[in-house]
Amino acid sequence: MNTWASIVPLIGGETIAMENIFKTKPKYFLTFDGFQANEEHLLNYYNNEIPYINLSKGEKHTEGVDVVNTVCPCAGLSSLSPQAASNSPMNDWMIKSAEYVLTEVKPKVFWGENAPRLASKMGEPVVKRLRKIAEANGYTFSIFKTKSLLHGLSQVRDRTFYFFWKGDQVPMFEYIDRKPSLIADDIRSIKR
C-alpha cells in the first residue's frame, strides 16, 4: 500500500483524488504560514484528524511517505495574472516545497499542478531551478502539459503537471484523448 501526504494543498480536489486512488487518507498535511485560511476547508473535510504541520513554525513531519502532492500557487505563471513572470515570488512556493520534500521527506514521487506557462518559455527558468533541485537530491524531473478537454471533461482548462521521480527512471504516460462531455449534460446529471 502506498502512503502519501500533501504540501501546501490549498485546494481539496487533488488531495481528495489522491485518497480515491490510494484508498487511504493522507498521513499528514505540510504547510507554511499564509495558507491557513485557504486550507481550513480541507482540514474540516477531514474533521481535523489529519496532522497539520506548519513548517514555518519549525514543526517536522513524523514519518516518510511514498508520494507527496502539491498545488502551489500558480499566479506567478498564470495568464490571468498581470504580474506573471518567471521571477515572480509566487513561483518560489514550487521551489521551497520541492526543497523541503526532496531533502526531508524523500518520497518515491513528488508531484504538483501549476499553470500551463510552466511548460512554456516563460516557465523555463522555474523548470531549470526545479530540475537542479531534482538532480541534487537523486530525482529525475518531468513535466506534462495537458487540457481538461482531452480527459473527457467539459471544462476548458490547460494545466501543467510536474513530477520528481526518485532515481533516473521516468514512466511513460499514456496519451489520453477522451471525447469531452457537454456541460449541459454534466449539469443535468447532478443528483439533487
For the regions a language model picked out, list residue spans one by one.
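Class I S-adenosyl-L-methionine
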Residues: 58-67, 74-192
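Active-site glycine-rich loops that stabilize anionic/oxyanionic intermediates
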Residues: 10-11, 72-74
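Structural cue for short, hydrophobic secondary-structure segments
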Residues: 6, 69-71
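SAM cofactor-binding core of SAM-dependent methyltransferases
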Residues: 2-58
